[in-house]
């Protein structure tokens, strides 16, 4: 699945570059974006006594756009995001931070109305490997936060054809399973996570 996504992204980048060569009625744009990534997580802890709190992080990446007759657009992106989840278990006397590194490829359809663009589409997760350290300092895999395919929707504004301001929300269609283990040699506890996020990014278009 992930190999197919990589091939799809490569084809989209190639199509964008080709369209930039002079296809009538089609305009391309490239840019870089960066900003705030705020996770909105719902944790179903089951029998676990732990408490989890997702903290705000950052997001940055590459923005591409294929604008058709100035109104409709196809907008593939490559976005990396990073944030931490605070893990606290008073009963087990254990505290740590789960470090979340995520690489996603939104493939959005964009509709322009004046200065505003309305964007919606699927998001493909290529990398999602949250980890934390157990009592002995060993790295433990928490398990992925997003399913392979999730969604994103939002609005963006392009000013002076160079400055892009983008706000969006996104998340998974279903919960994923994660594992809490304070000792890598012991069996862990399983919880369910439904992950959403909100992002506010500013970009420069070329």
For the regions a language model picked out, list residue spans one by one.
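Residues that define the transmembrane beta-barrel architecture of outer-membrane proteins
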Residues: 26-28, 52-58, 99-103, 114, ...
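Residue-level signature of outer-membrane beta-barrel architecture
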Residues: 64-66, 109-113, 157-159, 204
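Outer-membrane beta-barrel biogenesis signature
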Residues: 5-8, 12-33, 206
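Repeated loop/turn-to-beta-strand initiation elements of outer-membrane beta-barrel proteins
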Residues: 71-74, 115-118, 161-165
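Flexible, solvent-exposed loop segments that connect beta-strands
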Residues: 40-52, 82-101, 128-147, 175-193
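Transmembrane beta-barrel strands of outer-membrane/channel proteins
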Residues: 32-38, 76-80, 120-124, 153, ...
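Membrane-embedded beta-strands of outer-membrane beta-barrel proteins
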Residues: 60-62, 105-107, 151-153, 167, ...
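Outer-membrane beta-barrel "beta-signal"
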Residues: 33, 157, 161, 192-206
């Amino acid at each position: 699945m992930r190999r197919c996504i990589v091939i799809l992204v490569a084809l989209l980048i190639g199509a964008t570059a080709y369209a930039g060569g002079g296809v009538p009625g089609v305009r391309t744009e490239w840019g870089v974006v960066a900003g705030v990534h705020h996770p909105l997580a719902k944790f179903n802890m089951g029998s676990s006594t732990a408490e989890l709190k997702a903290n705000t992080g950052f997001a940055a990446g590459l923005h591409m756009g294929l604008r058709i007759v100035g109104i409709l657009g196809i907008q593939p992106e490559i976005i990396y995001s990073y944030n931490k989840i605070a893990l606290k278990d008073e009963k087990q006397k254990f505290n740590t931070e789960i470090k979340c590194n995520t690489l996603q490829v939104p493939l959005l359809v964009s509709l322009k109305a004046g200065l505003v663009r309305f964007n919606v589409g699927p998001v493909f997760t290529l990398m999602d490997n949250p980890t934390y350290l157990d009592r002995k300092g060993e790295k433990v895999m928490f398990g992925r936060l997003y399913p392979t395919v999730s969604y994103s929707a939002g609005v963006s504004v392009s000013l002076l054809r160079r400055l892009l301001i983008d706000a969006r929300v996104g998340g998974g269609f279903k919960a994923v399973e994660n594992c809490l283990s304070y000792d890598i040699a012991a069996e862990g506890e399983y919880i369910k996570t439904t992950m959403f996020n909100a992002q506010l990014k500013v970009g420069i278009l070329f």
